[in-house]
């Protein structure tokens, strides 16, 4: 993903976290964004404008009446140029001004004039943040369409422990991506995505599982959320960074996955079953650790619930997309799955094809639909995710 052709305006106010915004500005430039920065006068006490000028290649604006600038009505030109505004750190003072339409410096004037998406990241002492006045002002910003990024908790600069920390750089970047990186062509759709492996316990120590990392399912959930959908992510244990979705549902077993999906299915418009759900589980789970003994150990297994096999015949207009990982006869097996489970689409791949296995950041997939098969080239899983959503959107119309 990149931000080429997009202008991101950073508004930096006078909090101790102001210095952290240098890394954000640098990261945005590396992603191809055109970055403009406006600082309040108090912010210049924590980090100098020249730092941002060096990182962005633009003059850092502070003074509303700066004469050493090209002849334009600056607060209007910047407001029109920006595709998104991020005010971070947003102090209690700046939040109060924005909430009440006060425009007494360059930053608040531009924010008031701008019509683009506006993101606000409060960062301050816990007592200031939790003060009812500040909370009312934050609620006012949300009422007027601002997106408020929740503060993180931890040890603050004042040594207090509590909420009020500026979120990490990747969180701020994620909010920017959500605002402008992709068209909101999935707005209004409720999409459930499953991801990752399941774990079927054998005893208190061991379980049966597979090699799935959840990368493909997480990529679909992330892309759907960025494109405006209300996303429910139902996932097995993974080591991946959490995805910001409408509802996050962690599970462990296939039975838990079955219950999580079936209980929500009636409310969904689309289900993308990207999880690698176990087909079998131990028929009995030992209460204590199974001890090593001479000779072999035989484990009786039983079938787990067939999620798509259950909901496919019962669907009422929902779009069902299954996944099929094969090692041979991929097209035949995946086509049979499409028909047997009453699916609208199957995303098939062959584990033996280079770049299509577990744990990698790429995939080689074939879309199986009632119209036939369409093979895609080697792509990143992020690009595959968008291709899947494009196909779903096209076929729902």
Language-model segment annotations:
Residues 1-119, 125-397:
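A cross-family phosphate/adenosyl-ligand binding-site feature
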